[in-house]
Amino acid sequence: FWAAYQKADEAETVSEKFALEAIAEAKLMESGVMLPLQSKGGNYSISRVAPYTFDYTLWGNDMDRYHNAVVTTELIKASDVSTMRAKWAELKGTGEYEAWAKSYLEEQGYTLKDTYNYQLYTQDPTTWDILATSQSVDAEAIVNTYDGLMEYDGEGTLQPALAESYEVSDDGLTYTFHLRKGATWVDSQGRKVADVTADDFVAGMQHMMDAQGGLEYLIEGIITNASQYISGEVTDFSQVGVKAVDDYTLEYDLEAPCTYFTTMLGYNVFAPMNRSFYESMGGKFGVEYDPDAADYTYGKDSDSIAYCGPYVVKNFTSKNTIVFQANESYWNADHINIHTLTWVYNDGSDATKAYNDAIAGVVDGTGLNTASVAAAKADGNFDDYAYVALTDATTYSGFFNINRNQFANANDTTKAVSSQTEEDAARTKQAMQNVHFRRALAMGLDRGAYLAQQVGDDLKYASMRNSYTPGNFVTLEEEVTVDINGTEKTYPAGTYYGQIVQDQIDADGVKITVWDPTANEGAGSSDGYDGWYNADNSWEEMSQAVEELAADGLTIDADNPIQMDVVYASSSEVFTNR
């Protein structure tokens, strides 16, 4: 995998990079270290939120911005959801859908409101520093507190945010953004801190590279000297390709033309940060950066960040609620639909709590698990309000620990204590180093039965995903020729990413299907079927593993089994059943 990935990293064109990354992904799946399980969506849901009234794109953080959500006081009927989805497809790209959705809902007798009680969250943010994290639990909350340069709307169109306009140099190496004047930073009490300027994006990027929260790789090889600064080869940040030409002109210099550069701006690695506020919280840059310093408080709580987005956090009660209130100083305050955004906590111990809260209006929607589907059918709400949620690019995977060194809960060693002896652990570790053993496990898991514990048998394949990256995530922009196991293969423009992944897997003789060109009514898909689970293939892989491990001195048979531990949250009925 790593050799294939490095080759992709050196690609000269975007399409070549996509094709080589597809080959690398095939190698990673063949390794059996990570098993793709499901996407987000594909389950029954009920909601008061009109579909497609916030970003739906398959990348970045904009999908978690809710200021333009259209929310009603009543649950929206499934038939109306279907009508609105069809109308969205008709109006996509015109900029007219949101206004139409509001008008349609009012014509159908719904009442619009300016509050949104977000579907139950299950984990507190671990930091409020958007530039020092790669965790979705953090970004999903913090993204509502700042604006980026540009932002996707509900129709999938990039719209100006803090940047009013931009231009690209003829050689494609320089992007120049012109920032709007009048945007401000405020503290958690709404008091002005400073004006938003181009330097905020310079400071933000340097802090992101200093913190190395896990997403810095996104700009490596893209922005000039980003890789070198992150590795320490370059220590003078002025040599990195991000510059404030003046207070309202921001310039990015790229190592090579990148046609998708503006589509990356929704990722939190491009978030701004006010330099003086950061320094007032003990923050430093470069070699002096030390998040463990006694006086470093930036991002430790919601009071220790500055805000330039549609909301400020007015209340954060751990494992209870997070309340976002409209930022009165927000540059676009007159054009947001939601003035109070409230996140409600749910630990998952009560399988029907989310459904009951949605019916009662405590939250404005929820996905339905098997228990809540039964409840909805029993009380008559299912037929009227339940619809199948759309899937997105999120992929949830299962991970095999091939180098385990922890045998109890790291935070409380009296919990989740493994029954393995030292000999058991050594045998399991040796077995897990064998690729055929790992493949046997991956091919032996009935993912349909696994997912059915949450969504029921009728939807168990609806959200099932067979690859890490959805096969239809991108298509080649131009013809590309790549080497697949010594044979040159040419792919025309328009070829799906997933097709290249599957071709490499087939060439390697690994019996999994991660791209089916006949799926999704002939459009092709990586979703909606189980391309991994096969008892015969699993047994074939295990037989080879047993033979190879025996040659290495490890006997596996009925009297000498390999013991596997699965750690799960026993408070959750779904996790327990899985």
Task: Kindly label every feature range from the protein language model.
Residues 298-302, 329-379, 392:
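Ligand-site clamp/hinge motif
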Residues 1, 31-50, 371-538:
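Local pocket/hinge segments that shape ligand/substrate recognition
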Residues 1, 14, 39-42, 90-91, ...:
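Ligand/substrate-recognition segments at binding pockets and active sites
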Residues 1-119, 124, 137-141, 442-506, ...:
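Detector for C-terminal structural segments
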Residues 133-136, 140-143, 153-157, 235-239, ...:
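Gly/Pro-rich hinge or "lid" segments in bacterial periplasmic/extracellular proteins
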Residues 164-219, 245, 251, 357, ...:
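Aromatic- and charge-enriched surface segment that lines or borders ligand/interaction sites
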